[in-house]
Curated annotation (Swiss-Prot):
Provenance organism: Mycobacteroides abscessus (strain ATCC 19977 / DSM 44196 / CCUG 20993 / CIP 104536 / JCM 13569 / NCTC 13031 / TMC 1543 / L948) (Mycobacterium abscessus)
Entry-linked NCBIfam families: PRK00278.1-1, PRK00278.2-4
Protein name according to UniProt: Indole-3-glycerol phosphate synthase
PROSITE patterns linked to this entry: IGPS
Family: Belongs to the TrpC family.
Keywords, ordered alphabetically: Amino-acid biosynthesis, Aromatic amino acid biosynthesis, Decarboxylase, Lyase, Tryptophan biosynthesis
Claim: Lyase is one of the keywords in the record: yes
Gene3D superfamilies reported for this sequence: Aldolase class I
Keyword Lyase in annotation: yes
Amino acid sequence: MSSGTVLDSILDGVRADVAAREAVVDLATVKAAAKAAPKPLDVMAALREPGIAVIAEVKRASPSRGALAEISDPAELAKAYEDGGARIISVLTEGRRFNGSLDDLDSVRAAVSVPVLRKDFVISPYQIHEARAHGADLILLIVAALEQTALVSLLDRTESLGMTALVEVHTEEEADRALSAGASVIGVNARDLKTLEIDRDCFSRIAPGLPSGVIRIAESGVRGTADLLAYAGAGADAVLVGEGLVTSGDPRGAVADLVTAGTHPSCPKPAR
């Protein structure tokens, strides 16, 4: 967590935005809304179904590429993903760099019956209760963004609300920290959030060192079925795909192609 990185800049904005939201809706109110929300869906069951799971992302923009897609109706896009066979829908809710919002999360949650991931830079318990209040079943925790005590605390809080934590890593050291914190679902992001550079060998280096009981998700760099199959061969249980879907012109078909490849008899099987 060195100063001056892209990640640091994003986190500065997130802190300001969380403080602004909490000034309008306090933690007690958000906790009450989270408690009143429908029970979270079973994410682990979705990830353990046969084949490579596809997590399809509602993603308007990114720090590395800028604007990606004009998504006027996130619910319609999410439904197309679900119809294509996506097992989980990921929704970016960070506004400054990704043009996402909690309104997007609300729209998607109302439109689909599969689990929904809140994809954001979570640094505060407030965001976890907020995610639950808005219907998230799964929440992203980024190891590079958190000190170890905060990671452990936020992971525990996520699970105490019945949600599942997707704990994201980019290095072997971060993977060790994720395991020490008790992560049962680990995402290996090929993109270094501090520099935005892609390392496509990142997953194949880190995944073999993860215990067999841990769900392994490959993040970033999935451009099509060949990438899915490569990640499957390296031990992936699931792939998270955003840019490749929102820029495809046929999101339902693009998801369906990945799902077909991930469930084909020739596809390498996850080591569960």
